[in-house]
């Protein structure tokens, strides 16, 4: 009996392989208001046309597979397939294209960032026909975003809880991040909060290690918070990292934080996972806890310009999954972050309606339809000389977080906190008087040094510290 090479048992079905572009490249398609739209930076293998590469992305991230299958006839591919509807070359980059793909809303489970990412980026990034692939942006339609609860509280509710208005909030990551005992850790928290900071913070990898178990840390940090509050009359907080090896353990830690009466907990949302993050966010909403989000592992995913997922996509996903703060880079510190790109995704975190603006990397107009905003956290290699630039770049609805820039003060932790608070108050006052922080920042800080010896000492220590490297990820020429 000869081998079967073609099946003719069903009218209209023919086994075999055909080009993706015959089905999934549809330049005539008009996008719907309910479609999820994606902008991919595609680098095809030599000899692969951009239309075929874009169609392959649309197919492999929706209904397609490498060959025609029988069961295509049991559903409506026109209803469910992703469509590559537009392709444009990237200026100044050889063999790179921005491919726009539209996905029908029915492809995605309601309220699940996990399912959304599994569909759109779960499998296609290993496709052999592509040399590299990067998800640059997503347009989340209101029809889908309304299935998410979003941040537990949002910017305005946080300000009301803390009773702090008209300025950025100040934070500090306790250093060294690993190795301190719980009591010494709590002591450092107290000194920083007593000196004038609003928050102190667990670093991303502080969980429950042999040198400091989580329950001991929570208790000593709570004691530090209450003592500092009593002495300053200000509401204080410490980001207690609830991230754990299981969701059950994470929720147990969050519940203990609630029992202690502290205002905020923390989660590493990329290493912990979106399912865990959404669960924790819902718990925080129901129990009055603010939720600080660390983006540990993000640069593994987002730093390379031609492959991965841009952070603006991860930021949108976090806003849907839930978090009241998220780290966003500093522009001026030690970590990667070009100014216009950073401001683009900061707007996507905070604002209700964001217009398309390719000069800042925003590929689609995004309407969050009143979903609460997320406060961006500037953290990483910043000190008092950066305060004018940070205040000017990030504005009031931000957290400026100085770890080494507080604990590295030559006189100790509390004077380091005083220096940062004085620098911030001076910058806010100067801005409110109409002065140009970008141009007059150094003069403003020097003037404040005359009546703050703590600030003067900090300025002397860090006067020559700069992190001047060209960013890897930059805006495309348009």
UniProtKB/Swiss-Prot annotation:
Modified-residue entries (N6-carboxylysine), positions: 201
- Specify the signal sequence span: none
Alphabetized GO MF terms: magnesium ion binding; monooxygenase activity; ribulose-bisphosphate carboxylase activity
Which residues are noted in the entry as substrate-binding?
123, 173, 177, 295, 327, 379
User: Bound how, and how many: what does the cofactor note say?
Assistant: Binds 1 Mg(2+) ion per subunit.
Q: Which reaction does it catalyse?
A: 2 (2R)-3-phosphoglycerate + 2 H(+) = D-ribulose 1,5-bisphosphate + CO2 + H2O; D-ribulose 1,5-bisphosphate + O2 = 2-phosphoglycolate + (2R)-3-phosphoglycerate + 2 H(+)
- Can you tell me which residues form the catalytic site? 175, 294
User: Which controlled-vocabulary keywords does the entry list?
Assistant: Acetylation, Calvin cycle, Carbon dioxide fixation, Chloroplast, Disulfide bond, Lyase, Magnesium, Metal-binding, Methylation, Monooxygenase, Oxidoreductase, Photorespiration, Photosynthesis, Plastid
The listed locations are: Plastid, Chloroplast
Cofactor requirement = Mg(2+)
The protein's matches in InterPro entries, at most eight in alphabetical order, are given as: RuBisCO (IPR033966), RuBisCo_large_chain_AS (IPR020878), RuBisCO_lsu_C (IPR000685), RuBisCO_lsu_C_sf (IPR036376), RuBisCO_lsu_fd_N (IPR017443), RuBisCO_lsu_N_sf (IPR036422), RuBisCO_lsuI (IPR020888)
Q: Which Gene3D superfamilies match?
A: Ribulose bisphosphate carboxylase, large subunit, C-terminal domain, RuBisCO large subunit, N-terminal domain
The protein's Enzyme Commission number:
4.1.1.39
As for what it does, the entry says: RuBisCO catalyzes two reactions: the carboxylation of D-ribulose 1,5-bisphosphate, the primary event in carbon dioxide fixation, as well as the oxidative fragmentation of the pentose substrate in the photorespiration process. Both reactions occur simultaneously and in competition at the same active site.
Family the entry assigns:
Belongs to the RuBisCO large chain family. Type I subfamily.
| NCBIfam families in alphabetical order | PRK04208.1 (NF003252)
Q: PANTHER family, per this entry?
A: RIBULOSE BISPHOSPHATE CARBOXYLASE, RIBULOSE BISPHOSPHATE CARBOXYLASE LARGE CHAIN
Task: Note the subunit structure.
Answer: Heterohexadecamer of 8 large chains and 8 small chains; disulfide-linked. The disulfide link is formed within the large subunit homodimers.
What is this protein called in UniProt? Ribulose bisphosphate carboxylase large chain
Q: Which organism is it from?
A: Neurachne munroi
């Amino acid at each position: 009996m000869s081998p079967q090479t073609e099946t003719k048992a069903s009218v209209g079905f023919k086994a075999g392989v055909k080009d993706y572009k015959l089905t999934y490249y549809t330049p005539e398609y008009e996008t719907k208001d309910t479609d999820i739209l994606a902008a991919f930076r595609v680098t095809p293998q030599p000899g692969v046309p951009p239309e075929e590469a874009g169609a392959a992305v649309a197919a492999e991230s929706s209904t397609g597979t490498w060959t025609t299958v029988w069961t295509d006839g049991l559903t409506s591919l026109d209803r469910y397939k992703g469509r590559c509807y537009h392709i444009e070359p990237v200026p100044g980059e050889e063999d790179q294209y921005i491919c726009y793909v539209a996905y029908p809303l029915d492809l995605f489970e309601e309220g699940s960032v996990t399912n959304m990412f599994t569909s759109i980026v779960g499998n296609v990034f290993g496709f052999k026909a592509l040399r590299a692939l990067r998800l640059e942006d997503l347009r989340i339609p209101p029809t889908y975003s309304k299935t998410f609860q979003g941040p537990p509280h949002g910017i305005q509710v946080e300000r009301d809880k803390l009773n702090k208005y008209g300025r950025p909030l100040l934070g500090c990551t306790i250093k060294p991040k690993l190795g301190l005992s719980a009591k010494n850790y709590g002591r450092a928290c107290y000194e920083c909060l007593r000196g004038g900071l609003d928050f102190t913070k667990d670093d991303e990898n502080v969980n429950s290690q042999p040198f400091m178990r989580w329950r001991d840390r929570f208790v000593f940090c709570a004691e530090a918070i209450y003592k500092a509050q009593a002495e300053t009359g200000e509401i204080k907080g410490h980001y207690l990292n609830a991230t754990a090896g299981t969701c059950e353990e994470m929720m147990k830690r969050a519940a203990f934080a609630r029992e202690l009466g502290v205002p905020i907990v923390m989660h590493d949302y990329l290493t912990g996972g979106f399912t865990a993050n959404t669960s924790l966010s819902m718990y925080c909403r129901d129990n009055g806890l603010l939720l600080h989000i660390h983006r540990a592992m993000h640069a593994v995913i987002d730093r390379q310009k031609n492959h991965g997922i841009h952070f603006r996509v991860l930021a949108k996903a976090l806003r849907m999954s839930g978090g009241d703060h998220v780290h966003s880079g500093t522009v001026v510190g030690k970590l990667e972050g070009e100014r216009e790109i950073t401001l683009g995704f900061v707007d996507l975190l905070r604002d209700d309606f964001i217009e398309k603006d390719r000069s800042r990397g925003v590929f689609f107009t995004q309407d969050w339809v009143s979903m609460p905003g997320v406060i961006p956290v500037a953290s990483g290699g910043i000190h008092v000389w950066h305060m004018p630039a940070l205040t000017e770049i990030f504005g009031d609805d931000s957290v400026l977080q100085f770890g080494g820039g507080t604990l590295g003060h030559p006189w100790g932790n509390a004077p380091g906190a005083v220096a940062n608070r004085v620098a911030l108050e001076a910058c806010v006052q100067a801005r409110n008087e109409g002065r140009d922080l970008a141009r007059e920042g150094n003069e403003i800080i020097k003037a404040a040094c005359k009546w703050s010896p703590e600030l003067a000492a900090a300025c002397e220590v860090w006067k020559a510290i700069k992190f001047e490297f060209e960013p890897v990820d930059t805006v495309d020429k348009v």
